[in-house]
Amino acid sequence: MKYIEWLNIWLNNYIKPSAKERTYIRYEQLIRTHIAPKIGGNDVNDLTPIVLQSFVTELLNSGNLKTGKELSANFVNMVISVMQNSLKTAHLVGIANEYVANKIKRPRAKEKQVECFSCQEQKKIENYVLNSGKDKLFGIVLCLYTGLRIGELLALTWEDIDFGKGLLFVSKTCHDGNDGEKHIRITDSPKTVNSRRVIPLPKQILPLLKGIKRRSQCEYIIADGDKPVFVRSYQRTFELLLKKLNISHKGFHSLRHTFATRALECGMDVKTLSELLGHKNATITLNRYAHSLLEHKVDMMNRLGKLL
């Protein structure tokens, strides 16, 4: 059996019924754009460790199909995961004589530098948003004070806020997709079990949200009139805002990093921060924000030194 034939069977019979829609779409795209054109025509049993490793090396050297830039190790590792999962199933059901994809050597992913906004940049962003008269932009401030991911933010509906108790409930996320004909927005369960969480809102945020709710024409908190907002559209809005304010470009996720950094600077303990961010455990938080924690320790020790 040709590998592409097996991949289609695997996608529709083993992935689509059990995985999140987002996972299915991602796998289908990786297969269509990267795997099928190169090794889809090979017989499943001709995919030796050397053939698979050569394909991985070619991927690393070929670059992004749109931009031409180098493909990240994380992206290539996603492709490897698709190959390994599909070929493992092929072996289990008797399509492949043996399972050899576990012999692929994965590229080492570079550790991403955590980027956050300075206090001055944060204040500049907040002042612009709060004085813009555009309720749609308020999501930027909300992320600075809750650490929400962009998908979690844009999936929020008014039912997710308990104004009486001042609580925000994170129970879903959203992402952009394509149904083959048009751009669509897909709402899904959160990234992980721990991503389901309750976030107490700062008391200064509540009256601002109440004002937006009074003016709102949509069930979603962040909206374009009576319509929800696409993830890429909101990212682009944020990029343009930074450009207008003459602040160096940072991804939308930097708002989440900024929240975490400010929380640590204010003395929040790591366990509480970990729960607010929806991390699996505090170790993840410690590893990701080690630099911020060190700066906080230096500041605390310098304050202590002033007692001498």
What are these regions (language model features)?
Residues 112, 174, 206, 277-302:
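Catalytic-site neighborhood detector that most strongly recognizes the C-terminal catalytic loop/helix
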Residues 30, 34, 42-54, 64-103, ...:
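N-terminal DNA-binding recognition helix of tyrosine site-specific recombinases/integrases
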Residues 29, 119-120, 202-248:
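Active-site/catalytic core of tyrosine-dependent DNA strand-transfer enzymes
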Residues 155-211:
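Conserved tyrosine-mediated DNA breakage-rejoining catalytic core shared by Y-recombinases
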Residues 69-73, 77, 92, 96-98, ...:
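Basic, Lys/Arg- and aromatic-enriched nucleic-acid-binding interface segment
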Residues 55, 124-128, 180-186, 266, ...:
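DNA/chromatin major-groove-contacting recognition/catalytic segments
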Residues 1-45, 50-53, 294:
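N-terminal DNA-binding module of tyrosine recombinases/phage integrases
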Residues 92, 141, 145, 151-152, ...:
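C-terminal catalytic core of tyrosine-transesterase DNA break-rejoin enzymes
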